[in-house]
Amino acid sequence: MAILHFSLPLIVSFLRPHASPRFFLLPRSLSQSPFLSRRRFHRTSAVSSAAVHHQSYRNPDDDVTRAVSVPTFQQAIQRLQEYWASVGCAVMQPSNTEVGAGTMNPCTFLRVLGPEPWNVAYVEPSIRPDDSRYGENPNRLQRHTQFQVILKPDPGNSQQLFINSLSALGIDVTAHDIRFVEDNWESPVLGAWGLGWEIWMDGMEITQFTYFQQAGSLPLSPVSVEITYGLERIIMLLQEVDHFKKILYADGITYGELFLENEKEMSSYYLEHASVDRLQKHFDYFDEEARSLLALGLPIPAYDQLLKTSHAFNILDARGFIGVTERARYFGRMRSLARQCAQLWLATRESLGHPLGVASEPVPPVCHRAALEKVAEKVSEDPRSFIIEIGTEEMPPQDVINASEQLRVLVLELLENQRLRHGAVKAFGTPRRLVVLVDAMSSKQLEEEVEVRGPPASKAFDDEGNPTKAAEGFSRRYGVPLEKLYRKVSGKTEYVHARVTEPARLALEVLSEDLPGILAKISFPKSMRWNSSVMFSRPIRWVMALHGDLVVPFSFAGISSGNVSCGLRNTASASLLVQNAESYEDTMRNSGINIEIEERKKIILEKSNALAKSVSGRLVVPQNLLNEVANLVEAPVPLIGKFKESFLELPEELLTIVMQKHQKYFSIIDESGQLLPYFIAVANGAINEDVVKKGNEAVLRARYEDAKFFYEVDTRKRFSEFRDQLQGILFHEKLGTMLDKMNRLKKMVSKLCLALKIDEDLLPVVEDAASLAMSDLATAVVTEFTALSGIMARHYALRDGYSEQIAEALLEITLPRFSGDVIPKTDAGMVLAIGDRLDSLVGLFAAGCQPSSTNDPFGLRRISYGLVQILVEKDKNVNFKRVLELAASVQPTKVEANTVEDVYQFVTRRLEQLLVDNGVSPEVVRSVLAERGNNPCLAARTAYKTEKLSKGEMFPKIVEAYSRPTRIVRGKDVGVGVEVDENAFETPQERTLWSTYTSIKDRIHTGIEIEDFTEISMQLVEPLEDFFNNVFVMVEEERVRKNRLALLNNIANLPKGVIDLSFLPGF
C-alpha cells in the first residue's frame, strides 16, 4: 500500500547555488525548476510603498493558475508538488517513522532551527491512533494525508503563494469563500508554538498556516512559514463525495479500495488489542535509547527515537490510558528530549559551518530627509483630513477591536502633545486593517510659549552681576536677549530661565517622526515575529498614511508608508490607490469593504434575521459569536443553509456547539425555542453564493455525521457503564486512574457536606452523583468535544432516568470552566465541584506537580481560582485548612503537613487575585487575608466591605487609633500572659481606657462583621487619644510600665482574627 500511495512522479530540486537570489517566490512555468540557494543571501524590504506584494500573480495563460479539471487524489499530490517546485521548493519524502503530523518530520522540526534557509514540500502520511474509526466514519481516518510546505525565511507573500496553489489544484478562488481564521498552534511534545490560521474554504478547514515562533523550546530566527494541507478533506470537497472511501485515488481505483482494510485493521489494533503494558515499556525503551544517542552526539537518530516515543504515547492515549494530568507528565518527558535534540542539531550545523548559508535579516528602508522636504513643499495652509491604515494579514477578532481603539487613543495623544488642531478622531478595524481617520487636522503646530531652564545663576553671572559665557550661550541657543533672562529658584538652587516661543513645525514632519513610536506601543495578548524585530498580532504588509493628498513618509516593521491600500482578496482590485484622506471611506466602500465594526454587525443581524424569517424561524445571536464573526470578515455576506432534520434527534447542546464553536454559524429556532434544521453562515466578499452555501452545508453535514457517530456509540450503553471505563484513564502515575479519583471524591462528600453545612437530606443525592462523577470522560462524544464535559453527563443521566438533581450535579462538577463562567447553582453540584478541586490540588501538590512561575501544565491556578470563586459567590463559610486536610486524608500517597500549607498559600494567592480583580486595593486584601484567609468567603466579604469603609470617615480613625498602641508594644518585652492590674493604674485616663476595653472585648470575635468591628472600635478612639495625651507609658517604675504595656497590648490584639491593620495606609 505504501508503494501505491507514494510511488508518484517527484520533481526534486537539489540544493545547489544559483546566481540570482530572489526575494519573492514566484510561480514560473512548470518546465522550469528553480533551485534553492546554498549561499548566504539577503532579502530586500518585505513591502514597498507600491504594495508590490499585492500584485496578482494569476495569469490566465499560466499553466499553474488556469482552470483545470477536478483532480484525483494522486493528481492533487502531483499538482502541489509541481506547483511548489516551480516556486523554488525542494520536493522531499515523508518520514520513515510514524508521525502524528508533517510538523514532526525532521524536514520541518530540525530544519526550522538555526539560520539556514530552507524551502521544501512533501507528502506526509500522518498517523493518529485516536482518530481510528474502523473506516466507518466518513471523515475520520487513523492515517490521513498531509501535504507539508516550509518556507524559511518568510518570503513576504506566502499567503498569496498558498492561494495560487489552490488555483493549481483547480479551485476557483474567486467563487469560494476562502478565509484565514485564527489558530494559535502549539505542540507541547516538541516545545513548539506559532501563530497563524486555520484556512477555511466554504466553512471547511482545509489547511493550517503557521508562522513558527519556537521549536525545541528555542526561539526561531529567522521565522519559518508552515503550510499544512489536509488532502482527504480537500479532495472530498472537490470531488463532491461524502465518504473518504469514495475518493477517486487514481483512474479506475478508489481510496477505499486501497486503504479501507488498513483503516479497519489498524483501528482494531489501536482501540482494542494494543497492549498498554508493552507500550509503556516501549515508551521507556525509546526514551532511554534517545538519551543514550544524545550522549553520543547523534541528534538525528535521537530524534527518530523521540518520534517512536510520541507514537507509543498516541497509542496509549487511544487506548484511553492517558488522563489529563498524566498527559502533562508524558509531554514533559518528550519535550525534554525535543529540546536536547534541537540544541544538539544546532551545535552540529554550526560546527559544519551552516552548509546551506545564513539567511540575512532584511535591511529596513530609510525615510530620507529629502523625501520629507519634497513633500513639505506641497503643504497647503488649509486643514485636511489625516488617515493612517496599518495593513496586516488576518488578525484575531478580539485584536481587531482592541488594537483599533489603542491606535485611536495613541493618535489622539500624539495630536494633543504635538499641538496639532483637529476635528473628530475615528477608529475603524477589519481583520486586515487598523485605521484611524482624523478630520480637519491643521497643517502645522500651534506656536507655544514655554519656560526653559538654563544654568544655575551662580554660573550664569559673576560676583558683580555680569553675564558669563554660560549665560551668553544659553541666550544664544534660544535666541533670547540677555536682558530677558530671569532668575527662579527650583528646589534649593536658583537657575536662569527664559520664555521661549516654540516654532510651529509642519504636521507632516511631526507625524513622520512620531508615528513609528506610537505603532510600536500597540500591544496584543499574543504577538509574533515574521523576520522583523517588530512584534505584532500578525505580519504587517502595508502602511498607508496621508494628510490630505500628501503621503506622510515614515517606515515601520521594514515597510515604507504610501498611498496604496488593499482590496478584498478575491476581487480584481487587489491594490487600491487612495487619492486623499478625505476620499478614504468612499474608496473602501466602493471596493466592497466595510471598515466599521458596528456597521458590519448591523448588516449581519439585518440580513440574517430576514433569512431566518424566511423559514419561519428566529435567529439565536450570542453576543460573543456576533463580535467574533463581525471581525472575521470585511464584507459580510450572510447565507442560509439547511441540514437533515434527522440530525435534530441529537442533543441540542451537541448540535449547537458544532454550529457555534466549530463553524461560527448562527442557529435558528422556532417560536417554542426548538432548533430548526437551518443555520446562518457569514461569508466574506464577492463569492458564488450557491457554491459557498453548498460547501457550508456539506461541512456541517460532515460535522453532524461525526457527532451522530459518537453519540450512537455512547448510547449503546447505559451511562453507569462508563464509570468502570474510568479505570483505563490515568489521572496521574502517583494518584491512580480517574476511577480512583472518583472514589476519593465519594469518600470525601459526607464530611464535606458537614463542613459546608449542607442539609443532611441532600446527602444521598450527593453520594449518588459522586458515584457517577466524571463518567462522561469515557464517552465518545466528550472525547471528541471536550467542551461538552458535564453537559453530556447531564444528558446521559436524564436519558437513563436519573433524577434532575443528580443530573444537574453531574454538570455542575465542571463549573466554573473558565474565567467569567457560571458557578454551580445547586448545593449538590457545589459539593462535587469543591471536592473535585480539593482532590486535584492536594493530590497533585503531593505528587510534586506544583506550578512554577512560568509553567502550570496541570492548570492548578485555574482550578484554585474556580475553587475560591465558588466559596465566595456561594457565601459558604468553611475552615479551609480543615477541608484541605480532609482531601489529604483520602490520597493514595502520604501528604505532609508542609504540602497542605503550600496548597493553602497557593489558593490564598488566587483569592488575593480574585479580590484585586474585583476592585479591592492590594493593601486591603493583604490586611484581610492575613487574619481571615482560612475562610475565603468571610475574607472576601470583609475585603469588599473594608474597601468601602476605607473611603469613609470612621474607618481611617480606627486605623490610626490602633496604630499607636501597636507601634508602642511592637518589639517590647510585654511578657506572655501578663494580666492588667487595675490597682497599678495611676491616672483616670488609664482607668477609662481599661473600662472601655473591657466593655467591648467580648463583642469582638473572629467571626464579627467588619462594619460591626469598626463601630465597636470607635469607642476606643477618644479614650486612646486622652491616654496618649496625658500618660507616659515608658516610666521608670517597672510595675507601672509593664501594666501600661499590657493594657496597650490587649488593645493592639483586638483586631486579631478580623484584620491586620498594619498593611493599611495611615497605620
Swiss-Prot record:
Record-linked SUPFAM superfamilies: Class II aaRS and biotin synthetases, HD-domain/PDEase-like
GO cellular component terms, semicolon-separated: chloroplast; chloroplast stroma; mitochondrion
Free-text function comment from the UniProt entry: Catalyzes the attachment of glycine to tRNA(Gly). Is also able produce diadenosine tetraphosphate (Ap4A), a universal pleiotropic signaling molecule needed for cell regulation pathways, by direct condensation of 2 ATPs.
Matches recorded under InterPro entries: aa-tRNA-synth_II/BPL/LPL, Gly-tRNA-synth_bsu, Gly-tRNA-synth_heterodimer, Gly-tRNA_ligase_asu
One GO biological process term: regulation of embryonic development
HAMAP family attached to this UniProt entry: Gly_tRNA_synth_alpha, Gly_tRNA_synth_beta
Family designation: Belongs to the class-II aminoacyl-tRNA synthetase family.
Quaternary organization: Homodimer.
Keyword list, A-Z: Aminoacyl-tRNA synthetase, ATP-binding, Chloroplast, Ligase, Mitochondrion, Nucleotide-binding, Plastid, Protein biosynthesis, Transit peptide
Enzymatic reactions: tRNA(Gly) + glycine + ATP = glycyl-tRNA(Gly) + AMP + diphosphate
Organism superkingdom: Eukaryota
Coiled coil: none
A GO molecular-function descriptor: protein dimerization activity
Subcellular location: Plastid, Chloroplast; Mitochondrion
Presequence positions on this chain: 1-50
Pfam short name (any one): tRNA-synt_2e
CDD domains: GlyRS_alpha_core
Binding, substrate: 513, 624-628, 855-859
This enzyme's EC code(s): 6.1.1.14
Main EC class the enzyme belongs to: ligase
Protein name (record): Glycine--tRNA ligase, chloroplastic/mitochondrial 2
Binding site for ATP: 589-596, 619-624, 744-745, 859-862
Gene disruption phenotype: Embryo defective. Developmental arrest of the embryo between the globular and heart stages. Plants with partial loss of EDD1 display changes in patterning of margin and distal regions of leaves.
Organism of derivation: Arabidopsis thaliana
Gene3D superfamilies: Bira Bifunctional Protein, Domain 2 (3.30.930.10), Class II aaRS and biotin synthetases, domain 2 (1.20.58.180)
